[in-house]
């Protein structure tokens, strides 16, 4: 029986194969609805048993995206924030691990009054509660992406919960969007619809009839195939959307709009119909497709074989380029290859900037230090993020301050000079006496910026700024005097002065040598590039033009 719903719900499912771009499609649709004046929020349901991705290998899962409130979430939450230009919270990412943990805890507390606890209704009710918690008088549409592929065992409780929500809030308040692959068979010379038909049949077998289907392919999709899918899957022709690969992820909203998906959704859900305001997004697309300059940035990391491990970093670099109408080419450099001066010279030859991203563990650290040394000695613009800042401190301590045994306790617990140490409230975690998951210094924290520094200039003269963090280690306060005496500028600290947040070199010594303990990439937007990345790309442009070489 239908009930009054303050928000409309749109569920996004995937079929045939994973990695079809459900998150990007959902984000693009969200952007279109927002550009029509609607208030949109988004959520991702992940079917894995981990409570969150915080302890997962980046090679398996990609980056961990941290929200303002300190949640470690799926990388798709980053897409949602960037496309909607909004800040989401922990409620935006729900996992099977969270659901089962909550249900089991309630059972132990006696909350089920002696019931036999089962997947239906207890697990599905918990899932529904998490989805409906996104409802608000301030939200017109909740877009919920259901991770995995239709047919996966792990996804079944989430799909059942979504089916029940449609039943409870009424079909006029709920929309199902299915994203499916049309594979191209070279011997036949055509795209095939049968896998999509089977995928929709699997959805219908569990009680879900999609309202629209987004067809993914590596080439244009003929109208005749769209008509066939409409007939065989019982979906209106206007609800069958062709979405071939686009030149840029930022083109996807235009593709979906040309196919009429946003208008179809608005009509089906009875939402207020307004024209799309393209002003902001057209400016982004103009900067994407009509750059006036070009720079190459070396991203020196441990997980470069899977670019998704650094997704927000690469998007922030590109957005920094948009601010200067500059195409940013990323050179992926495995940090192990920069261990020697010769290796660093070879790998970084011809780049206009070097970025050292975050990470964990000792592998590849000496290569990061080698890349930092090369950039510092050759005046190449350098930006260090989280672990990147810590490696910059290690390199400077060794090669400039004369502390040859300088290291981090994360990599060497017997380091002669532990210039990077374990945070006081993290020692029990490192010792294995407390849970590892969800216990780092996570979320939005403020920092005070020192006057007459590069970082303060980049932030527009602000005395205090807030950025998201994810770390257990910090620059050791015991070594701050010797580092500063050697010329390193500690340009930002926590409000109580106890934690180093930013380090840099004076610009008369190096054009751009800046490290941050935070993760500024997590707050960058294509429509609002982050000031640190804007400044970094500006320095790279100057270096490219031969005007950024330091005198001293």
Curated annotation (Swiss-Prot):
Residues 296-546 form the Glutamine amidotransferase type-1 domain. Residues 1-271 are annotated as: Amidoligase domain. InterPro entries: Class_I_gatase-like, CTP_synthase, CTP_synthase_N, GATASE, GATase1_CTP_Synthase, P-loop_NTPase. GO terms for biological process: 'de novo' CTP biosynthetic process; pyrimidine nucleobase biosynthetic process. The active site is at residues 386, 519, 521. Gene3D superfamilies: 3.40.50.880, P-loop containing nucleotide triphosphate hydrolases (3.40.50.300). Pathway: Pyrimidine metabolism; CTP biosynthesis via de novo pathway; CTP from UDP: step 2/2. ATP binds at residues 19-24, 76. GO terms for cellular component: cytosol. CTP binds at residues 18, 152-154, 192-197, 228. Mg(2+) binds at residues 76, 145. UTP binds at residues 18, 192-197, 228. L-glutamine binds at residues 359, 387-390, 410, 472. The keyword Nucleotide-binding applies. Keywords: ATP-binding, Glutamine amidotransferase, Ligase, Magnesium, Metal-binding, Nucleotide-binding, Pyrimidine biosynthesis. Allosterically activated by GTP, when glutamine is the substrate; GTP has no effect on the reaction when ammonia is the substrate. The allosteric effector GTP functions by stabilizing the protein conformation that binds the tetrahedral intermediate(s) formed during glutamine hydrolysis. Inhibited by the product CTP, via allosteric rather than competitive inhibition. Its EC number is 6.3.4.2. Belongs to the CTP synthase family. CTPSs have evolved a hybrid strategy for distinguishing between UTP and CTP. The overlapping regions of the product feedback inhibitory and substrate sites recognize a common feature in both compounds, the triphosphate moiety. To differentiate isosteric substrate and product pyrimidine rings, an additional pocket far from the expected kinase/ligase catalytic site, specifically recognizes the cytosine and ribose portions of the product inhibitor. Homotetramer. This is CTP synthase.
């Amino acid at each position: 029986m239908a009930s009054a719903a303050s928000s409309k719900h749109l569920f996004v499912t995937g079929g045939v194969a994973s990695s079809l771009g459900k998150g990007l499609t959902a984000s693009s649709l969200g952007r279109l609805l927002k550009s029509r004046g609607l208030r949109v929020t988004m959520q991702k349901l992940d079917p894995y048993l981990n409570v969150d991705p915080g302890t997962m290998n980046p090679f398996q899962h990609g980056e961990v995206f941290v929200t303002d409130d300190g949640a470690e979430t799926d990388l798709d939450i980053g897409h949602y924030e960037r496309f909607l230009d909004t800040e989401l919270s922990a409620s935006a990412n729900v996992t099977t691990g969270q659901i089962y943990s909550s249900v089991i805890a309630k059972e132990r507390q006696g909350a089920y009054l002696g019931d036999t606890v089962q997947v239906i209704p207890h697990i599905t009710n918990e899932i529904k509660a998490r989805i409906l918690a996104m409802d608000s008088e301030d939200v017109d549409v909740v877009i919920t992406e259901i991770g995995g592929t239709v047919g996966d065992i792990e996804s079944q409780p989430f799909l059942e919960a979504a089916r029940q929500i449609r039943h409870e809030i009424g079909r006029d308040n709920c929309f199902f969007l299915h994203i499916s692959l049309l594979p191209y068979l070279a011997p036949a010379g055509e795209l095939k619809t049968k896998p999509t038909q089977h995928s929709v049949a699997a959805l219908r077998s569990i009680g879900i009839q999609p309202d629209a289907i987004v067809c993914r392919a590596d080439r244009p999709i003929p109208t005749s195939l769209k008509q066939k899918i409409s007939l065989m899957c019982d979906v209106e022709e206007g609800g069958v959307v062709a979405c071939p690969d686009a030149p840029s992820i930022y083109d996807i909203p235009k593709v979906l709009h040309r196919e009429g998906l946003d208008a179809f959704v608005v009509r089906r859900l009875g939402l207020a119909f307004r024209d799309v305001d393209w002003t902001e997004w057209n400016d982004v697309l103009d900067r994407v497709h009509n750059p006036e300059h070009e720079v190459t940035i070396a991203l020196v990391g441990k997980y470069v074989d899977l670019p998704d491990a650094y997704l927000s970093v690469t998007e922030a670099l590109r957005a920094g380029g948009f601010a200067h109408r500059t195409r940013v080419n990323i050179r992926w450099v495995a940090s192990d290859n920069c261990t020697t001066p010769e290796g660093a010279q070879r790998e970084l030859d011809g780049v206009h900037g070097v970025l050292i991203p975050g990470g964990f563990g000792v592998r590849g650290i000496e290569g990061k230090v080698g890349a930092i040394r090369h950039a510092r000695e050759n005046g190449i613009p350098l930006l260090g993020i989280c672990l990147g800042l810590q490696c910059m401190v290690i390199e400077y301590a060794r090669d400039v301050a004369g502390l040859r045994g300088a290291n981090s306790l994360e990599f060497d617990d017997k380091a002669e000079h532990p210039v990077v140490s374990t945070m006081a409230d993290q020692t029990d975690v490192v010792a294995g006496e407390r849970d590892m998951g969800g216990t780092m210094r996570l979320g939005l924290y403020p920092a005070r910026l020192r006057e007459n520094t590069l970082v303060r200039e980049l932030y527009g003269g602000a005395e205090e700024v807030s950025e998201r963090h994810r770390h257990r280690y910090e620059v050791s306060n015991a070594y701050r005097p010797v580092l500063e005496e050697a010329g390193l500028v500690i340009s930002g600290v926590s409000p109580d002065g106890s934690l180093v947040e930013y380090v840099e070199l004076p610009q008369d010594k190096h054009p751009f040598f800046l490290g941050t303990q935070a993760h500024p990439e997590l707050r960058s937007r294509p429509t609002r590039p982050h000031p640190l990345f804007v400044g970094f790309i500006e320095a790279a442009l100057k270096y490219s033009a031969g005007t950024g070489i330091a005198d001293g």
